């Protein structure tokens, strides 16, 4: 049983697929899927999406924080509107989703929170020139670090997952060099397989990790 909550309710030529087409694929694979139109910047929409998920499936066992905004421009070119957007979606979004899902996760027998964010590495090479994006993305990792400490005693696993190489997605094609970069990327399925491995482990004691 999977709920997909996102803004993508209509086709975008640059980013193929919608919450509806993704749910259709899940159903074809034999699963139950619930598409939920949701803008992660707005608390009420996230709260409604989480509530509908719990009502539809009888609870929530797993939260995956995959929503992310990316803009790799440097400080001279990155406008504050885009800077704020990345922080609203990335760090704040991960924190908000965890906060609102927590009452349901507490009732699960094997609760997990998995966030797509990098290991915390303060080497300056990860901050320049894309400082705005790095701060926002590392904010998601700080959510993992803090919640793992806070929720571990409650038996809730909180971990992050990050690919060692770029992944062949629409974002990579549009922002990181187009088709020329894709040939050096891994397929998205490798991330899905890694997530499945993490989320099928016992939550107790399996927390605070930054998996690569």
Residue ranges and their predicted role:
Residues 106, 112-153, 165:
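Catalytic loop of short-chain dehydrogenase/reductase
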Residues 160-161, 178-212:
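C-terminal helical subdomain
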Residues 30-32, 59-60, 105-119, 153-157, ...:
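Active-site loop of short-chain dehydrogenase/reductase
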């Amino acid at each position: 049983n999977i709920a997909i909550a996102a803004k993508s309710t209509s086709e975008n030529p640059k980013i193929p697929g919608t919450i509806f087409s993704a749910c259709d694929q899940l159903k074809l694979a034999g699963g139950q899927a619930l598409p939920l139109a949701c803008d992660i910047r707005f608390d009420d929409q996230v709260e409604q999406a989480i509530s509908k998920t719990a009502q539809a499936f009888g609870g929530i066992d797993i939260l995956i924080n995959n929503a992310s905004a990316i803009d790799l421009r440097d400080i001279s070119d990155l406008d504050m509107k885009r800077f704020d957007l990345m922080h609203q979606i990335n760090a704040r979004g991960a924190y908000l989703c965890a906060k609102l899902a927590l009452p349901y996760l507490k009732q699960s027998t094997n609760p997990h929170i998995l966030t797509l964010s990098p290991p915390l590495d303060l080497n300056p090479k990860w901050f320049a020139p894309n400082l705005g994006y790095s701060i926002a993305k590392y904010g998601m990792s700080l959510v993992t670090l803090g919640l793992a400490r806070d929720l571990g005693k409650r038996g809730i696993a909180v971990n992050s997952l990050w690919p060692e190489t770029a992944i062949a997605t629409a974002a990579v094609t549009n922002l990181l060099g187009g088709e020329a970069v894709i040939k050096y990327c891994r397929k998205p399925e490798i991330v899905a397989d890694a997530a499945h491995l993490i989320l099928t482990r016992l939550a107790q004691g399996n927390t605070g990790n930054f998996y690569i």
